[in-house]
């Protein structure tokens, strides 16, 4: 699929070699084929072709970020924002750079900017919530998780993570409720049973705690047996279901994002904080 796409872009570029997006798309195709050298060359050519297009800088910055070349990534995201001060994805990506280089307050400021420009972006709320949790700002983290639950109600991780914040704040019953919500969405979620069991001990519910421990142990044993099972493919549906539960409705709004190229509208660039 991507090799055919590269052939098509080659033909187009032979006829029209002044279209930056063609080089960006060809670079993305190489990136999907794990050819980072040619991807980088194409992003460079896109930038030389149109130095005012933020997409070229953002794509090259994304490649630098992927390769943990944070200084170069930051410079590219800065340039993209200089080209278009409302280019959300570069604020988002620069926040990832700031987080990776231990600058949480600057990362928060960039996530704030993304949300200011796109107030329903659940993945940005989720990342900001995790960052706020890391710095101990639990109440604001809860507010962000509430937004994620509003915009992506079937995302299992929001309930799991929010439960941890409630537990930190001593709101044990609400934490149990969230672990229960996570389990309803994904009944094989062993960790959710483990943590709910511990909290049930605190709530003087030894029977419930024992049941959760037992279920967790069974789920873990089942998972391990699947890993060793030659018919593992029969369990693929469960894995795919979990992947779907982790998905976010994270389509960015705004004019700049309408220009993003890529096989799913740019979603593949957005990522969770590590």
Briefly describe each language-model feature range.
Residues 1-274:
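Alpha-helical tetratricopeptide repeat
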